[in-house]
Amino acid sequence: MRKIVINGGLPLQGEITISGAKNSVVALIPAIILADDVVTLDCVPDISDVASLVEIMELMGATVKRYDDVLEIDPRGVQNIPMPYGKINSLRASYYFYGSLLGRFGEATVGLPGGCDLGPRPIDLHLKAFEAMGATASYEGDNMKLSAKDTGLHGASIYMDTVSVGATINTMIAAVKANGRTIIENAAREPEIIDVATLLNNMGAHIRGAGTNIIIIDGVERLHGTRHQVIPDRIEAGTYISLAAAVGKGIRINNVLYEHLEGFIAKLEEMGVRMTVSEDSIFVEEQSNLKAINIKTAPYPGFATDLQQPLTPLLLRANGRGTIVDTIYEKRVNHVFELAKMDADISTTNGHILYTGGRDLRGTSVKATDLRAGAALVIAGLMAEGKTEITNIEFILRGYSDIIEKLRNLGADIRLVED
């Protein structure tokens, strides 16, 4: 079992370059199944979720080549084989294979999605959309079987009962080769949705309105190959901005799109964080006299649920008390118990996180309970005096490309250890 060991309390300086967006690429790769020629992705992050998706694509018959941050996928040999639960249960994003296999073959048998345990994340919205387009859905143990083999998928008007990034993207993927027009109302607006729509349009799809709450898709018969650059990972960027404000003596974060982080940066400015924003980078100064604030997550363009955990250690540096409420994932509080082991003044009650800043953290043994909780513990370990050991680190490696190397380059005493 591997663990991350950190000797904290060191000031960090330098530059970090943000990788391609995890939450985009995990949808882009399954979407490539719809193409009838080679698709090349640039700026692909080196994370375990990508490695798992590549393995699945190769099992299905795709030819995949990877060099540096470039991924070249030839989907012409893909066969519609069942993908049982055991092979894909580590991936929340495995549900994107539902849309792509339905779109290409008219049927799919795929294991139910896994990923981080953050509370109820039902796929009902996905199934409702597929059924509106003419598919049938049935559970077979831990697998989902979908079929539109007899009639094919057709366009439909679909209203999302709740705003859902995954369901919006999956519906787009399924609809691009459906017969007729599909309209998605109350669609999610995240940048990753625009990124997936851009890839599909570059492959020959007809999608309008991505990034708004109404998306219109006119089905086409075929999609061709293309080359596409993955957008920068706004969650990775927000994580390193939080880290820079917590322990930095001046850190520049490169390959950042400010417009994707406006809600997050507004809250940092409310705290008193000093930073300079330029065209594609953010320079975070050394901080002092930070103010405690309240955080409430919301769908984009609000404060991202994926950033409330990485921000928490910085909040613990601030003066005063505050609350954090995650309206998206009710169980996104497990990092609280681990931070408390590090002597943080933090607790949770009825889904609300209550914290008081200003107390020094101390290193100890903690466990990453999910991806973003793991990021929070890394930041806390860098802040703390003494040694911090983080176990269950596979969660962290799922979503943060080259995290050990990037932090070492800033001067961190951090290493990956085989236990």
Swiss-Prot record:
Q: Where in the cell is it found?
A: Cytoplasm
Q: What top-level class of enzyme does the UniProt entry assign? A: transferase
What molecular function does GO assign, one term?
UDP-N-acetylglucosamine 1-carboxyvinyltransferase activity
This protein's pathway? Cell wall biogenesis; peptidoglycan biosynthesis
Sites where the protein binds phosphoenolpyruvate? K22, N23
Sorted keywords for this record are: Cell cycle, Cell division, Cell shape, Cell wall biogenesis/degradation, Cytoplasm, Peptidoglycan synthesis, Pyruvate, Transferase
What EC number(s) does this enzyme carry? 2.5.1.7
Q: Which domain of life is it from?
A: Bacteria
- Spell out the coiled coil positions from the record: none
Task: Name positions with the PTM 2-(S-cysteinyl)pyruvic acid O-phosphothioketal.
Answer: C116
Protein's GO biological process: cell division; cell wall organization; peptidoglycan biosynthetic process; regulation of cell shape; UDP-N-acetylgalactosamine biosynthetic process
Protein residues bound to UDP-N-acetyl-alpha-D-glucosamine: R92, R121, P122, I123, D124, L125, D306, I328
Task: Tell me where it mainly resides.
Answer: cytoplasm
One GO CC term of this entry?
A: cytosol
Membrane-crossing ranges are: none
Q: What does this protein do?
A: Cell wall formation. Adds enolpyruvyl to UDP-N-acetylglucosamine. Target for the antibiotic fosfomycin.
Q: Which family does it belong to?
A: Belongs to the EPSP synthase family. MurA subfamily.
Additional note from the record = This strain of S.pneumoniae has no heteroresistance to fosfomycin unlike other strains of this bacterium in which MurA1 is required for heteroresistance along with other as yet unknown factor(s). Heteroresistance is the ability of a clonal population to grow one or several subpopulations at a frequency of 10(-7) to 10(-3) in the presence of a higher antibiotic concentration than that predicted to be effective by measurement of the minimum inhibitory concentration (MIC).
Name the record gives this protein: UDP-N-acetylglucosamine 1-carboxyvinyltransferase
For this protein's source organism, the top of the classification is: Bacteria, Bacillati, Bacillota, Bacilli, Lactobacillales
